[in-house]
Amino acid sequence: ALDFFKYWSVAPEFRGIGEKDVESALKVDITIEGDGWYADSTAKESYAIMGNIAYPISSYNLNFENYSDNRKKLLEAGVIINFPIGDLEISASREQLQYTDRSKNALLSKLKDIVDKLPDVLAGALADCKTYWDAKIIYNELFYHGGSLFALKDVIKKVGISYTDKNGKKWNMKHNHFDTSKYGKDI
């Protein structure tokens, strides 16, 4: 029952339950975030948040044409997406989304926007790294086996991300390694 409150912007006060249980149930671990969305490493699936209520997003109901669609891969990463009230239609039971054309278009449009901006968001996450090596460590922690964004590894392979060092040199990061063919001597 506590899971219902996990993504509320302000959690209610709970009585009759241990503080550690509440903390554990409401724990959100934001790995990366963009405008109106974030990846939560504790999420078992992706959710559309509308009016503090988390609605699971079904990739099946979005009718992706193929398994390798980047938007489908994004949903496998536990992405939490905020929507204004009324942008998505909900079922009569108010427990799930209705996958009408309007709701599907809103979801697909937002997913495309996130995928399009993902390289910039990820490059921003690496911007505070002092060295190439620090950036490589973070990159591998996120995208390597067991990393919180492992589901996005195929998306990253397609769109690519880069790290710019303090001297302005841009390092292209691909397939869990850096493009060292161009900069090998500078490592």
Q: Residue locations for each model-derived region?
A:
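GHKL/Histidine-kinase-like ATPase module
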Residues: 2-109, 115-116, 137-186
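Short, highly charged C-terminal tails/helix-capping segments
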Residues: 125-139
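Flexible helix-coil linker/hinge segments at domain or subdomain boundaries
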Residues: 112-126
